[in-house]
Amino acid sequence: MSRQANRGTESKKMSSELFTLTYGALVTQLCKDYENDEDVNKQLDKMGFNIGVRLIEDFLARSNVGRCHDFRETADVIAKVAFKMYLGITPSITNWSPAGDEFSLILENNPLVDFVELPDNHSSLIYSNLLCGVLRGALEMVQMAVEAKFVQDTLKGDGVTEIRMRFIRRIEDNLPAGEE
């Protein structure tokens, strides 16, 4: 019995390592295809956005999470459910703005950066920028326009990885006239 449980753990670890290495290969290829880090950062964000737009359906179906009533509740669901479900980590939520429209997600351990060192000639590369795009894309599909950006990164010598989230506005559904 313990042998089967051990296999499941090994399989999960292999899957996460394969994901990490595959992501690294993707970023490496983007660095070869684009002339500067800023263009790579934009592509990672764009790819993440497209993933987030599709991932939200899977998330809502698998998590049974209802509609969030405010940005604080949204932050809790992102940190405690979504990150745990897809990356196996639970970031902490800190640095709320007084207005309650901004917060930080602190990732003590970013699984995307396992086995990674940034070369000196890519100092402005935001290696995990895909995550910001995923957050923006997923939240846009539930009528929330947000800004997400990295403000600290362990790959750049910081102690933790920090994603700053800012609520911009609620997106209103624009239905054609006569439809509801």
From Swiss-Prot:
Keyword Magnesium: no
InterPro entries tied to this protein: Bet3, NO_sig/Golgi_transp_ligand-bd, TRAPP_component
Compartments (UniProt record): Golgi apparatus, cis-Golgi network; Endoplasmic reticulum
Keyword field contains Transport: yes
Lipid addition sites, S-palmitoyl cysteine: 68
One record GO biological process: vesicle coating
Pfam families for the chain: TRAPP
Cellular component aspect of the GO annotation: cis-Golgi network membrane; cytoplasm; cytosol; endoplasmic reticulum; Golgi membrane; TRAPP complex; TRAPPII protein complex; TRAPPIII protein complex
TM annotation in the entry: none
Keyword annotations from UniProtKB, A to Z: Endoplasmic reticulum, ER-Golgi transport, Golgi apparatus, Lipoprotein, Palmitate, Transport
Subunit and interaction comment: Homodimer. Component of the multisubunit transport protein particle (TRAPP) complex, which includes at least TRAPPC2, TRAPPC2L, TRAPPC3, TRAPPC3L, TRAPPC4, TRAPPC5, TRAPPC8, TRAPPC9, TRAPPC10, TRAPPC11 and TRAPPC12. Heterodimer with TRAPPC6A. The heterodimer TRAPPC3-TRAPPC6A interacts with TRAPPC2L. Heterodimer with TRAPPC6b. The heterodimer TRAPPC6B-TRAPPC3 interacts with TRAPPC1 likely providing a core for TRAPP complex formation.
Functional description taken from the UniProt entry: May play a role in vesicular transport from endoplasmic reticulum to Golgi.
Family listed: Belongs to the TRAPP small subunits family. BET3 subfamily.
Record-given protein name: Trafficking protein particle complex subunit 3
Record organism: Homo sapiens
